[in-house]
Amino acid sequence: MESIVQAKRVLEIFKEMSQIPRESGNEKGISDYIVNFAKNLGLEVHQDDQFNVVIKKPASPGYENRPSIILQGHIDMVCVRDHDSNHDFSKDPIANIIEGEWMHADHTTLGADNGMGGAMMLAILEDDSQQHGPMQLLFTTNEETGMDGAFAIKEGQVSGDYLLNLDTEVEHDFTVSCAGGCHVHVNIPLLRENNQPGYDAGLSFTVTGLKGGHSGIEINEQRANANQVLTRVLYDIQQQYPVCLASFEGGVKHNAIPSKAVAVLSVRAEDVAAIKTLIAYQEKQYLHEYGIQDPGLTFVVEDVATPDVVYADDTTEALITYIYLAQDGVHSVSKSIPNLVETSDNIAIVRENEHTIEILISIRSSNSNSLEFLAKKMILLAKTLGVSAERTGGYPAWEYDKGSKLEEQAISLHNEMFDTPANVNAIHAGLECGLLKGVLPNTQMISFGPTIVSPHTPMERVHLPSVENVYVYLKALLAKLQ
């Protein structure tokens, strides 16, 4: 198309990449393609056991004393197809269909996230007319399902003064910070006993209809957490009626705000009508509390068989008390970046294991000290109740480096080149830059990229004029960085 002039080679390389299966966990083929690409250029290249690739290219003549630069992106893609598509991601090429200013696939994800960034990196690599300081290219794997590639990068494997990540998905946006995170697993001993005499009715109580959402993205909207709403109502029922809890389950993913939670209760038949009335009243109260952000909130109560076995009182008390007291949602906002959530937690999953009831709490913060405080607070609450808790899965934050030389130069150049001013932002989710900052603590980082709409869906498409603009900008930035 006419708007693509300098980025023609980028689209050619992207088409080549689209011939190679690269679903997360199946990246050897695309990793080998990149290795051979570098070898054909006579460049130093290293591939590790996670299929991460590091390519080193010397500085352009006269640029030997410029800052060293890392270009970074991930090579895997999310593979999703329409229900009526028979596309086989393990072997079939991804179509590159251009309509007007946009490229999309054929009823599948396109893989522009982050394949277009990778194609830009390779186009830069083979262009010997491009001016740049000492340069390394880092291609990471399995970003979409756990950032395993970035987790595997070791100190000394890659180095540079500046790192340019090409995985931001809105042209003119520059990401300068992301949250770190960890999980806290609370394990309550699962003690059961026979149902007590007189408890001759069963009720299933479901909190449903909530929006849920990604706990690193939608947490700022302060949506209802189904696990905590269910717990709060159960506590109020317990204050008025004899109740035995037979089961409790809610949430499915560590990074999703739970939209549904279900409990089964053993109650006295004479109290059933009153309990149903109380729950109906509580539904109105919670719609008043959450109706703006969660207008679909619904309480569903159904008669079920009377449970033969219920939780012991100690199990029920520890479960209800912990979830009731554990603060959920936004804890603090950034003092440096307007409207950015700094620290949050999500009571993500409550599930029965063989011998315990596990509560999984996902904690995020762009401030490492705040992250530590909240994790310790959640563990201390468990210990206070006499149950065990452990911290797992930590990954570092990419803390905002206000006034960094890289940010100053990148934003200044962008605003010289384009009428649309740069939008500097941060996100509350985890990014590869956060992990890489752990092994590159003195490297200044920034992230940008072309506009990609509906990533991770068959409607994914990339705006081609933005590919041209970002590539032209990247070339200019590499030549100018000091």
Segments from the language model and where they lie:
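Midchain, well-structured core segments that form catalytic/ion-binding scaffolds
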Residues: 101-104, 144-145, 151-364
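His/Asp/Glu-rich mid-to-C-terminal helical/loop segments that flank catalytic regions of hydrolases
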Residues: 156, 223-240, 269-272, 318-324, ...
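Active-site metal-coordination/substrate-binding segment of hydrolases
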Residues: 63-139, 143-145, 150-161, 324-328, ...
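Acidic/His- and Gly-rich active-site-bordering loop/insert found
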Residues: 2-101
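Active-site-adjacent substrate-binding region
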Residues: 218-220, 225-248, 375, 400-443
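Glycine/charged-rich beta-loop-alpha catalytic/anionic-binding loops adjacent to active sites
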Residues: 94-108, 211-213, 415-420, 451-456
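Zn-dependent metallopeptidase/amidohydrolase metal-coordination segment
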Residues: 10, 335-338, 342-358, 362, ...
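Acidic, glycine-rich active-site loops and adjacent beta-strand->loop/helix elements
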Residues: 75-77, 138-146, 168-171, 211, ...
